[in-house]
Amino acid sequence: MKIITRGEAMRIHQQHPTSRLFPFCTGKYRWHGSAEAYTGREVQDIPGVLAVFAERRKDSFGPYVRLMSVTLN
């Protein structure tokens, strides 16, 4: 499965009323440039996960990336 844009993930989320947004993993990755830097990268395929997208967040250590997923669980 590949990381897609947030807009594409939100369209998938709207098409499946029972889906929800959930963190894909617990790791934090240093932010590099924009979300497009992460789009297209491969992530492991997990049953029930419809899409994965990169989201920019910020804490006291600076900006980082959080991988979020659209799931059916």
Curated annotation (Swiss-Prot):
<dbReference type="InterPro" id="IPR009329">
    <property type="entry name" value="DUF987"/>
</dbReference>
<protein>
    <recommendedName>
        <fullName>Uncharacterized protein YeeT</fullName>
    </recommendedName>
</protein>
<comment type="similarity">
    <text>Belongs to the YeeT/YkfH/YpjJ family.</text>
</comment>
<dbReference type="Pfam" id="PF06174">
    <property type="entry name" value="DUF987"/>
</dbReference>
